Amino acid sequence: MTTTMSETIHVGPVGVTFVLEAEQTGGTLTAFECEVPTAAKVPAPHSHDAFEETIYGLEGTITFTVEGVDHEVGPGQAAFIPRGAVHGFVNRGDEDARFLAVITPGLFGPAYFREVGVVLAAGGPPDLEAIMGVMRRHGLTPA
């Protein structure tokens, strides 16, 4: 089975493009590319109890903090985030970073990013309560 990537969803300056959605994998996994500009504001630390996340670096270097420990992920490197682990990420480098995220099982998809993107596009300071509500609806627990 081959697929083409869907449209890029913008969540602030971060771009998310799904490679595989749950409907294409029988719910086994979802996979998306994430483009993170230097010093971009990224998601608050969070956890998810229903799925794991595997990260594979494509370009630049992204720092994932998992349970308080930093993991630098560059091209060809990977990191695994188990269920329940508090984590977040930041691009501390001087170039944009891009990584592939694989979610298993495929319980997390584009709807989350679209909803957060709408909240952020409203203008003004981000509505943190609204963002946390979106996170909870999609199985993420803010830390």
Show which residues each predicted segment covers.
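Structural motif
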Residues: G15, T54, T61-T63, D70, ...
